[in-house]
Amino acid sequence: MMQKGYIYKGLKPVYWCADCNTALAEAEIEYQDDPCYSIYVKFPITDSKGKFDDLGIDLSKAYVVIWTTTTWTLPGNLAICLGPNYEYTFVKVEDEESKSFGQYLLMATELVSTVMDAVGIKKYSTVGSFLGSELELIETDHPFMGRKSPLIVGDHVTLDSGTGCVHTAPGFGLEDFEVCNKYKGMFKIIVPVNEKGVLTEEAGDFAGLKTADANKVIAKRLEDDNTLLAMQKIVHPYPHCWRCHEPIIYRATDQWFCNVDMFKAETVKAIEDVQWIPEWGEERIKNMVNMRSDWCISRQRRWGVPIPILYCEDCGKVIVNDETIKAISDMFRRESSDSWYSKDPSEFIPASVKCECGCNKFRKEMDIFDVWFDSGCTHAAVLQERPELSWPADLYLEGCDQYRGWFQSSLLTSVATTGRAPYKAVCTHGWVVDGKGEVMHKSKGNVVLPEEVISKYGADVLRLWVASLDFHNDVRVSPEMLKQLSEAYRKIRNTARFILGNLGNGDGFNPDTDMVALDKLSDFDKWALSRLDSVIEKVKASYEAFDFYLAYHAIHSFCVVDMSNFYLDIVKDTLYCSAEKSEERRAVQTTMYIILDSLVRLVAPILTFTSDEIWKYMPHKSTDDLRGVPFNQMPEKTGVEISAEFEAKWNKIHAVRDDVLKALEEKRTAGVIGKSLDAGVTIFAEGADFEQLSGYPELAQAFSVSYVNVKNGADGEFKGAVEGVSVTVEKAAGEMCERCWSHAPSVGSDAQYPHLCARCAAVMKLDLG
């Protein structure tokens, strides 16, 4: 960056912590609401350049009024800045009770009523009208420093507050500094406050005062001289040091800077080539880069990464060339950057290196790098220096405050040196707060410690909590929320446990030899796989978009609604009562294996320990990598073919099933039936509904009852949510099979198994031989 001319040393106002005695970056600033006094100050006009001759104004009574919240900066005032296109006017004070009675006060026309209310002047009139540009170079006297403060113009002036006449102290403000520099040779920048926050001799009578103490003393001086128009106590956000939390100041000092303007356009282009998650992050960092000034990269601290710059002992010229860069880099590589502090330049700089003046003796720069410059170089120090790693990084992940911190410093150093961003994607997160949305503090007793959560619920519940929330915003955590998440976790785990149990019983299920082709699966099985395909698609898309909470909700809903509440419930009869190696049972096992194999892969990024446990116990294909889930690919969709007619059929079955379950519950409450298999159900429907439902032989299994009859009509006892369909529930006819618990006319038809239905008797004979 130095070789490209991006780095320079210069005098410029920077954030300065007088307590830490160092410059600060914007990312090292935190704002707190502070009480302070704002003051309105009168600067007497001494040379109007003839602009006011036609107004009949007594110049000895004419003043420009400024407003400031930092009284201590007034000794550094060199000018008053006006907006070139704003209208200004004189306010003649006609309030006899005012100390300013009979005076003419210049301010922005738009702010007259606001200012007069603030200073308590009730009677006044206005005289004259001027654009700010017409008043340029009119002279005023500084109220107490014995020098001129001319009127200048600048586009940074606003009418949001104050008087429209801006107190300009270039040693204490960047905009002040820049606008004064436009007036070439007119101003000599002064900084009448030292590194400890104490006013210097350049502050005149106020030398030796700390800035906080100077506020009161200067205000008293202004009041005694009748140049203090008004003083008000206000509370406003004020910058504080992030380390010591003390108020900071803006102070012009000699620092090392990076000229961001030289590669700003290139940086904005690089931003557009990055995936920002969430998307608004792109606009946010673009605005920050476009609006930022040069980057102050030096700090005045006793430890840190040194700025490897040398100065000529004789003429003070900065010495940086290929030889010094190589010599210092080699030393740092061998002995670390700490060697900078222990060695004399003569020990590591080649004797051939000389200043243009001929001197070969040098002194070291003792400032250190801004920590953000330091951390912003990690992409080069870590990724580019290690062949086993790739550059740029796939992802930078941090809190949303890092748009002005690590994300931006990394971006600037990378674009400056390589022309592109150091990352392919950037993802930001919010902060963790308690269940009420309040910041956690030990004193409040609302801190939730991760180790306590892990001890009580396990690490996967903590991971599930993280995944269950939209982390782009602040996320809440409380014992109640974690308890709810533990229940959700148990639902997912129990789904896997049920499937594992039914794949492992008997001789077990071997996916290499026992799988049933998709086209031979029942409609129940095909429906389950169609739901799985939908989940696979949604979860993978959610992971790609870093929307982990959408992935979690899709998985949880699938396990609870589609599996536990429906599919796994209705296939129990097949699993428990069909012959162990029958095609219908193998079909259900095939479906469950596909579901479990997909589910364990889908949950692995969130429930890492649980997925690993499932992987160890589940059956595997010979092509699986048995080392663990992460060594295998995410699942692909099963490819089961589902028509629109099929989907409509199952939507109807689900809707009618909900009504049937409610009707069963009514009869159970009335004591007519016990379990659902004690019931027989008659569905009444008309027209297309009758034709559709009467063609479903699977209804008894879908409703978990002994039998279902479908009749044309509307005579059902229970009318539910499905329009045109009603339900009647009766105690099932026939004896109960002691094996499958269904009531069937065939119970007792087999002499060998008189207490079983015909199906169960046949299975017993097949399995027992």
Language-model features: locations:
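Short cysteine-rich clusters marking metal-coordination/redox-active sites
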Residues: 17, 241, 312, 352-356, ...
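Cys/His-coordinated zinc-binding microdomains
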Residues: 21, 300, 316, 358-359, ...
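Acidic, turn-prone loop/beta-hairpin segments
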Residues: 14, 18, 25-32, 362, ...
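Short metal-coordination and nucleic-acid-contact micro-motifs, chiefly zinc-binding Cys/His arrays
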Residues: 13, 237, 308, 348-353, ...
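Residue patterns forming the tRNA-binding/recognition surfaces of aminoacyl-tRNA synthetases
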Residues: 1-75, 94-96, 137-139, 147-152, ...
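C-terminal accessory/binding modules appended to enzymatic or scaffolding proteins
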Residues: 150-152, 720-756
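Protease-associated
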Residues: 79, 86-165, 174-178
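Secondary-structure capping and boundary motifs in well-ordered enzyme cores
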Residues: 320, 361-372, 388-405, 442-445, ...
